[in-house]
Amino acid sequence: MKKERETANKYRQQALEGDLMAMNNMGVCYAQGTGVVEDHVMAFQWYMKAAELGDIYACYNVAECYYQGDGVEQDFERALHWYLIAAEKGDVQSQVNAANAFYLGQGTKEDHVKAHQWWLKAAQRGHLQSQKNVGAYYWNGDGVEKDDSWAAFWYEMAGQQGDPQAQFSTGWFYMTGTGVKQDKRKGLKWIHRATAQGFEHAKQWCRDNGYSIY
């Protein structure tokens, strides 16, 4: 406890001297009750100090506070405002959250084109669920022109990260030659990667089409 108090005091001094990271860290201290009495209103205030001065992590934290109603009244519109600021600065989770907001119409009008644009940015940074979302967008032509080759590409990116549903989808693309050059051997390898993880849909597909499950 003494060490935590010393750390919090150090952050406070640095924050008062204008250190943005320390301001954000003070917010974390108050949010978690680390070295100080837990106070979510104070946490929000420290996050906001740093966010208004441009700290990317604080921008995300302010957005989270508004989204959750944590230390401040819940406000989806203001949450999106701060997610977008952090997203423009390159924060991947903020890009994802902004996409989700546009997709669901939280704090803004529903806009699947903007949702796709932000998921794409996150996908390009390696965010797995965003890669799947972008693949689905291209497959369904939702918010973007339908493009089987891009759908296959993004599902394969997600599959390479170990997602069994994406692995099965990638296998199906290769088995059927949809969006890629047909390669049944490669396709079956992908499907077996999914079955090895217990993905039931892939197992059933193998049974239905006369292939071994493993």
Per-segment meaning from a language model:
Residues 1-32:
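N-terminal segments that cap or nucleate solenoid repeat domains
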Residues 16-19, 32-34, 39, 52-56, ...:
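Short helix-capping/linker turns of helical repeat alpha-solenoids
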Residues 153, 181-200:
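TPR/TPR-like (Sel1-like) alpha-helical repeat modules
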Residues 25-32, 36, 61-68, 97-104, ...:
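Hydrophobic face of amphipathic alpha-helices that form TPR/SEL1-like repeat modules
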Residues 2, 193-214:
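Terminal, low-structured helical/coil segments at or just beyond the last alpha-helical repeat
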